[in-house]
Amino acid sequence: MGRFISVSFGCLVVFLSLSGTEAVLDCPSGWLSYEQHCYKGFNDLKNWTDAEKFCTEQKKGSHLVSLHSREEEEFVVNLISENLEYPATWIGLGNMWKDCRMEWSDRGNVKYKALAEESYCLIMITHEKEWKSMTCNFIAPVVCKF
């Protein structure tokens, strides 16, 4: 009886210690996980509109990558450096309604910015770690996130 209580108590301690931790997100094959989101880079060159549409077709809830911290930006820079042929990618930040209000294509709030200048469509240049304005018809690789 004493051994059963000891084993039960040990299991309870382990359960309680793990219950506060975040579960690791199980991303589909080819996608990488970071902070409860999945990311994938594609070497397909697309303009901003086609890139966003492409991402929404990859996986339910997927959009062009949105960046909410310096750490997340570093993760995406590494993903691009290791997986894409070009040192830049579209990001989901743009003036979606042409009313001077910027928002992420996934409708997330803009809390973190590293803008080189204000623009309509933005591209992230990895070696400079800056976001730059680019005509929306420019073609660039794609990083999707869900």
Curated annotation (Swiss-Prot):
As for family, the record states:
Belongs to the snaclec family.
Q: How does it assemble?
A: Heterotrimer; disulfide-linked. The heterotrimer consists of 1 heavy chain (a metalloproteinase) and 2 light chains: LC1 and LC2.
- Which molecular-function annotations from GO does this UniProt entry contain? metal ion binding; toxin activity
Q: Which organism is it from?
A: Daboia siamensis
Record's Gene3D superfamilies?
Mannose-Binding Protein A, subunit A
Q: What is its main location?
A: secreted
**Per its UniProt record, what SUPFAM superfamilies does this chain match?**
C-type lectin-like (SSF56436)
Q: Has keyword S-adenosyl-L-methionine?
A: no
Q: Where is the C-type lectin domain?
A: 34-145
The protein in question is named: Snaclec coagulation factor X-activating enzyme light chain 1
Q: Which residues form the signal peptide?
A: 1-23
Disulfide linkages recorded for this protein, renumbered to the chain, are C27-C38, C55-C144, C121-C136
Cross-referenced PROSITE patterns:
C_TYPE_LECTIN_1, C_TYPE_LECTIN_2
Q: What else is known?
A: Binding to prothrombin and protein C (PROC) is hardly detectable.
Identify the tissues in which this protein is expressed: Expressed by the venom gland.
Compartment(s): Secreted
Give the protein's biological function. Answer: Regulatory subunit of the blood coagulation factor X- and IX-activating enzyme. The enzyme activates coagulation factor X (F10) by cleaving the Arg-Ile bond and is also able to activate coagulation factor IX (F9) and protein S (PROS1) by specific cleavage of Arg-Ile and Arg-Val bonds. May serve as an exosite by which the enzyme recognizes and binds to the Gla domain of factor X (F10) and factor IX (F9) in a calcium-dependent manner.
Q: Which GO terms describe its cellular component?
A: extracellular region
Glycosylated positions are N47
Give the keywords, sorted.
Blood coagulation cascade activating toxin, Calcium, Disulfide bond, Glycoprotein, Hemostasis impairing toxin, Metal-binding, Secreted, Signal, Toxin
Q: How is it modified after translation?
A: N-glycosylated; probably required for conformation. Removal of easily accessible sugars does not change its functional capacity, but removal of the core sugars with N-glycanase causes a virtually complete loss of enzyme activity, apparently as a result of major conformational changes in the molecule. Not O-glycosylated.
Which InterPro entries does this one have? C-type_lectin-like, C-type_lectin-like/link_sf, C-type_lectin/snaclec_domain, C-type_lectin_CS, CTDL_fold
